[in-house]
Structure formats: C-alpha cells, structure tokens
UniProtKB/Swiss-Prot annotation:
This is Protein mmf2, mitochondrial. Its main location: mitochondrion. It comes from the Eukaryota. GO terms for cellular component: cytosol; mitochondrial matrix; mitochondrion. It comes from Schizosaccharomyces pombe (strain 972 / ATCC 24843). CDD domains: YjgF_YER057c_UK114_family.
C-alpha cells in the first residue's frame, strides 16, 4: 500500500502532519480550520465554515480531487448551537449528491482558545 503526502503551499500545517494523504484511490484530508496565510481568522460560524471549506477545497485541488468527489465529512463544532448556521453555508458550498457526514460537538478544538468554532476533515475519491 502506498501513501502519498499532499500539501498545498498556500496553506500551512499547524503540526507534524500532512494536509492530506493519498492511498488506495482515496484522499484522506486532515482537519482544516479558518486559517489564512498561516493565521487563524476569527469570525462568525458562517465565515469560519466558508474559509474552512475553501481550505479543504484547496487541499483536494492539490491532490487532484474536488469537493464534488467527497465521500465522507466529519465536522467538529465547539458549540452545537452553531449547527444550523454552519449547515446553511455547508449546503451552499457542497454540491449534490452530498457526502456522508458526521457532526460532533467537540467542546474544544485546537484553535478554540483563539475563537475557533469549527474544524472539518474529509475523505474524497481521486
């Protein structure tokens, strides 16, 4: 089994990991958040969701895939009360047919202390 690391030069990693790994015809994306130019971008849950999905789209682009090829999405929210507002942006940005999805109220995510409200990881087909 081969593992091919994927990293976009437009995004930065916040730790010792790859932004994605290609293996077995699938792309496994690490969690993305509302980060631009290496810095967290505070904002509403809608703004953070939009930027987070844009970051995932960039990683998928570099991997040779796209949001259209998503098969599974995991969303981590710091506050489940943000679910409906996050969902509005999610529905707007992701094409049908929608991927399988899990959304969890995680309480804290790595950027919580800076105001981070959401982290999204995904699996896509090549």
């Amino acid at each position: 089994m081969s593992k091919v690391p994927i990293n976009s030069s437009k995004l930065s990693c916040g730790g010792p990991y790859n932004q994605a790994v290609k293996s077995g015809g699938l792309i496994f994306c690490s969690g993305q958040a509302a980060v631009k130019d290496g810095n967290f971008v505070p904002g509403t849950i809608q703004e953070q969701t939009r930027l987070t999905i844009e970051n995932l789209a960039e990683v998928l682009r570099v991997a040779g895939s796209s949001l259209e090829k998503l098969v599974k999405v995991n969303i981590f929210l710091t506050d489940i009360d943000d679910f409906a507002a996050m969902n509005e942006v999610y529905k707007e940005m992701l094409p049908d047919p929608m991927p399988a999805r899990t959304t969890v109220a995680a309480g804290k995510i790595p950027l919580s202390s800076k105001g981070g409200k959401i982290e999204i990881e995904c699996i896509a087909a090549e």
